[in-house]
Each structure stands twice: as C-alpha cells, then as structure tokens.
UniProtKB/Swiss-Prot annotation:
UniProt function note: Plays an important role in the de novo pathway and in the salvage pathway of purine nucleotide biosynthesis. Catalyzes the first committed step in the biosynthesis of AMP from IMP.
Active site: 77 (proton acceptor), 105 (proton donor)
Reported cofactor(s): Mg(2+)
Protein's UniProt name: Adenylosuccinate synthetase 2, chloroplastic
Residue positions binding Mg(2+): 77, 104
Major site of localization recorded for this protein: plastid
Record PANTHER family: ADENYLOSUCCINATE SYNTHETASE
Organism: Oryza sativa subsp. japonica (Rice)
Keywords assigned: Chloroplast, GTP-binding, Ligase, Magnesium, Metal-binding, Nucleotide-binding, Plastid, Purine biosynthesis, Transit peptide
Amino acid sequence: MPFSPPCLDPAAAAAASLSFLPAAAARPPAPCAVAPRSRRALRVAASVATAPESAAAQGRLESLSQVAGVLGTQWGDEGKGKLVDILAQRFDIVARCQGGANAGHTIYNSEGKKFSLHLVPSGILNEKTMCVVGNGAVVHLPGFFKEIDGLESNGISCEGRILVSDRAHLLFDFHQTVDGLREVELGNSLIGTTKRGIGPCYSNKVIRNGLRVSDLRHMDTFGAKLNTLLRDAALRFEGFEYSTKTLKEEVEKYEKFAERLGPYITDTVHFMNQSILQNKKILVEGGQATMLDIDFGTYPFVTSSSPSAGGICTGLGIAPRSIGDLIGVVKAYTTRVGSGPFPTELLGKTGDLLRASGMEFGTTTGRPRRCGWLDIVALKYCCQINGFSSLNLTKLDVLTGLKEVKLGIAYCTEDGKEIESFPADLDLLEKIKVKYEVLPGWEDDISSVRNYSDLPETARLYVERIEELVGIPVHYIGVGPGRDALIYK
C-alpha cells in the first residue's frame, strides 16, 4: 500500500536535503549545543496508556497470523528479543530455527530485570509459552544448561517448557577452539566471528560427520564418532591437540548431559506440524539477520546459517504456506559487529555518540559495535528477500538530540552512476558512495511516549519517510529497552 508523504510545517520541510558522501567516511552532523542524554537518563517512567492506545496495541497483536516470524534486517543486534518477548504473550509457542550461542538476545521482565539469552528462545519469560529449539540450530550443551540454571535461579521455571530437536547438531568446546585457530590463520583477513564455534559446527554438518542430539541416545557409539571429529581437527590445525584422556573426559561429560537433556529431546518437526493442525499460535524467533545470511549477506563476512525467511522452513520443518506475518526488525540507525562492508558507517564523533547513547556493545562478545546511519538500500534488499508484512523500528530514542539525521537512500559508483541493487561484489561495496537524505532531528525526550501522535513532528517525519522509501508499514516503534517502551502505530 503506498504511503502519502508526511505533512510538515514549512521550516521542517526546508530542513530536508540530499547529500553525497563516500561510504564509511560520512561527515557527521554538527554537534549539538547540548549533548544528547545517556540511555540511563532516557529511562523515565512510562506514561499511562490511553484507552484508544491500548485498543490499538491489542488490535495489532490479535491480528497477527497463526504462524508469524520476527527476523533481523541488518547485521544483527536490532532488538528482536524484546519484540519476541512482548508478542510471546499472545502465542503458544516460540521457536528458534537456526544459529546457536552466537545470537545474543537481551530482554527485560516486568520488574526491569535484564536477561541475556543466547540459545533459549526469548519467549521463556512468559510462563505459558512453550519454547522450541529447532533442527536448524546448533546446541552447545554446557552453555544451554548454564542459561537454564541462570533463569531458574531467578525464579523462571524451564521444566517442561523447552523442547530441543533430536535433529539439531551438537556444538562442542573443540568447535570453539577451532573457530579461534581459524581466525588466527586468516590473519588480517579475519572474518570477526564470535568464536562460539558456529562455523566449525555447521561445517561438520555440511560434510556429514557431525553429531546430532539424537546421538546422545546411543552413547555406545558416541565416543567413536567424537574421536573422528577430534582427529580431523588435529590433522587440520597444527595448534590443535587432544589425547585419549581428553576424549574419555568429554564422553563422560556428555553421558551426564544426555541424562539431563533427555526430557527436552523431541521430534520437533512432528511437534510443530501437529501444533499447526491444532491451531496453536507459533512465533518464530530469528537469530542474527539477513545481512549475515550465508547466501544473501556480505559473504564471507556472514554467519553459517540462513537467518532469512527461508531458514524458518528448513530450520523447523514447516511448509512455506503455513507462514503468515513476517515482522522485520530494524534499528533506527545501523550497527555491525566484526569485519565486513558497512557502507553508511560513521567513523567520527557521531558514530561514537550513537555507540555511547545506544549502549552498542555486543551481547555475545561485549565488543563495541560499529555505528552508522540507517541504510535504506540494504533495508529494501532485506525486505525484498523476506517479504515482510510490517517493520519494528527500534531505538528511535537514541537519535534524540541530533540536529539532523540521515538516511542512506542510494549507492553510486565512483563516477556517480547509481547502482540498482545491493552488490554481491565486496570490492564494489568498499568503493561505493552513499547518497544521503538529510532530515531534521529532535531534542525532546521521547522515552516516555506511548502514542505515535505524541512523538515530535520531526521524529514522525523520520518514521514515515522510512515507510515511504521502503514501502512497508512500521507497526512497532521502540523508544527504550523495557517491555513497555513500545509504540504501536
């Protein structure tokens, strides 16, 4: 559905302009006379929602399809976990379809307590929600049980509420060791992985010698299969060593894990399809994001799975026609952790300001995230691949205090020719110039706003311009980290 251009007063309209700047070297806007407040200062108590506003929120949530998905549209860290946590209250099942402990989802409970999850689905805070780890995920059992122990120590019951696919692959500690050795081997060309062993584990899956959760039911052959993996790693990497004693200790550890994991192990393909037949409501929680997709991302600076819409089907074993609404989560600016192209990256003071104000440090690694303006070209590319029905714009409050904000609306070659699609060529991506549209910023604290019409006019202009450029409506707007800090549009 087309969007009408937002109405502005003449002064605001005059403030919008276009500019060309080289990729990764965009000139930051002039600093504000008063520096934007910290995220902590922005966390004020939410105002009580009006009755019409509550009705709007209820309408948005109740209109979602039986099977819906929440996927990232950038390079991860968009804030998917918060939306999943909120939506989970209306769903019977929340499922992870791919990835592993490289995905860091930060959520807050009703008391404001922070939880950082990596493998357990974000729906776990909702006591009536069943959580599923699908066949497309890779499971590091020491980390999995550490998460469960942490949740239960905080009063969140996990017993009988988490199902793990018997087809999911097991990620071992040695995979993490190999991940680090691989990065060292790459030297200056390193990919910048989380070193959580994701790539090596998926590599074993693809060459068909990996161990799956179902192998824990056959501990008599488990040791021999694990020995094959360890031997291959030792042959491949000079710095990798293991002994018969190491193998024995690992097998003994997994014998205990097998006993503890037993109640969780399920044929989740059957469970998911039966749940669909029973009209259960299912919410799929994507890890990472489309720009990290093994096929569609900035290869080779990508993850080893498919965090796009296609990964839902292959990672859970459900049919494409069963999937309805897909919500794309996009930060109001762009961030990236690790190496790889980043056309709208800000290397100056504005990038530092966004990092500090947005608390942009990786949930999984703790590394500072690279920051830049919202990349509309990349966003449209992700929308094209996934077919999103709506968007969740997060962290709009972080832009408060900037005199002007920019949208990267086009890529151009060095000679000024506009590029029609998102390039696969990394050399081209590193050389492109970004065409920016400049919009006026806002000074008002928006962290307590819960009604779209109460946002500053220029903040609404920013949201509506994104809708107009992408052609997809923004239904949810994040203005803070808490559960309640969400505007339903």
